[in-house]
From Swiss-Prot:
Protein residues bound to shikimate: S22, L23, S24, T69, N94, D109, Y233
Domain of life: Bacteria
Binding site for NADP(+): E85, G133, A134, G135, G136, A137, V231, G254
Source organism: Alkaliphilus metalliredigens (strain QYMF)
UniProt-listed PANTHER family: BIFUNCTIONAL 3-DEHYDROQUINATE DEHYDRATASE_SHIKIMATE DEHYDROGENASE, CHLOROPLASTIC (PTHR21089:SF1), SHIKIMATE DEHYDROGENASE (PTHR21089)
Alphabetical UniProt keywords: Amino-acid biosynthesis, Aromatic amino acid biosynthesis, NADP, Oxidoreductase
GO molecular function, one term: NADP binding
HAMAP family with a match to the protein in the record: Shikimate_DH_AroE
Active site per database record: K73
Class of the enzyme per the UniProt entry, highest EC level: oxidoreductase
Pathway(s): Metabolic intermediate biosynthesis; chorismate biosynthesis; chorismate from D-erythrose 4-phosphate and phosphoenolpyruvate: step 4/7
GO aspect biological process, one term: amino acid biosynthetic process
Annotated protein name in UniProt: Shikimate dehydrogenase (NADP(+))
């Protein structure tokens, strides 16, 4: 279908820095074109010091909404009129909807991760889960997994206090999920993984300058019944996932999460379902 810009075209976009590398313009614009929707997605390099001006401009220009990425996901909250429950718990926003100048913030990262699991036929309900890392991705994923019925979540991080902070939020707000925080050591991880159903890497090990690194030093700590997941989507198969496959584990990369969070934002802005399989094929072909 031909892609046209008209006087009626609605604008959505991404506020953050740096953002030129983002997959979001490709994902959303191809989805708009495929469905014949009169929207366009652009990126805007916005740092913390000019975030307020950018948000005011979004209102003035009557954009349909926008995504938010680092370094603005926490800083934007005071600039919004309302935030969703999961955004409140997570403490960050990655999607904003503009309805007649009323800005509501959402966090679709955790739900996007759960969508990626669902695409693989996996539900977090009743699962014992181990998460490596305690940054923003870990916080979004852990809280959403708890909301979705996870039985037990253990978060390992070199700085235990960061992991404890996430656990405290879950314990206070979602008491049906048992949580614990611990330091990151191979022996501790091996012990935790013995009873685990799902192991998630929420660190940057495996991507960029860390591409040759893995969160685990040996396959000995894995077992074949374990599902091993990585939030990293480039490369499509991290060193961790290669190691897990050697043991016979089911593996899942971060592509489902990135598409899932985008699909949820797409639905919030347009009311339409993103053609996920079509978008997945396009991204994999790049």
């Amino acid at each position: 279908m031909e892609f046209k810009i008209s006087g009626y075209t609605r604008l959505v976009g991404l506020l953050g820095y740096p953002v030129r590398h983002s997959l979001s313009p490709l994902m959303h614009n191809m989805a708009f074109q495929h469905l014949g929707l009169d929207y366009v997605y652009l990126v805007f390099e916005v740092k913390e010091d000019n975030l307020k001006e950018a948000v005011d401009a979004m209102k003035t220009l009557d954009v349909a909404g926008f995504n938010v990425t680092m370094p603005n996901k926490q800083k934007i909250i005071p600039l919004l009129d309302e935030i969703s429950e999961e955004a409140r718990l997570i403490g960050s926003v990655n999607t904003v909807v503009n309805k007649n100048g009323h800005l509501k913030g959402y966090n679709t990262d955790g739900k996007g991760y759960v969508m990626g699991l669902a695409d693989e036929g996996i539900s977090p309900e009743g699962k014992t889960i181990v998460i490596a890392g305690a940054g923003g991705a870990s916080k979004s994923v852990a809280i959403q997994l708890a909301l979705e019925g996870a039985k037990e979540i253990t978060i390992l991080n070199r700085t235990v206090e960061a992991a404890e902070e996430i656990c405290n939020i879950i314990n206070k707000n979602i008491p049906t999920c048992k949580t614990s925080a611990t330091g990151y050591e191979d022996n501790e991880l091996k012990q935790q993984l013995k009873e685990a159903d799902l192991f998630i890497n929420c660190t940057n090990l495996g991507m960029g300058s860390h591409e040759e690194k893995s969160i685990i030093s040996s396959t000995d700590i894995l077992h074949p019944d374990l599902i091993v997941s990585d939030v990293v989507y480039a490369p499509p198969k991290t060193k961790l996932l290669h190691m897990a496959e050697e043991v016979g584990c089911k593996t899942i990369n971060g592509l489902g999460m990135i598409i899932g969070q985008g699909a949820l934002a797409f639905k919030l802005w347009t009311g339409e379902d993103m053609p996920i399989e079509y978008i997945k094929r396009i991204i994999l072909s790049k």
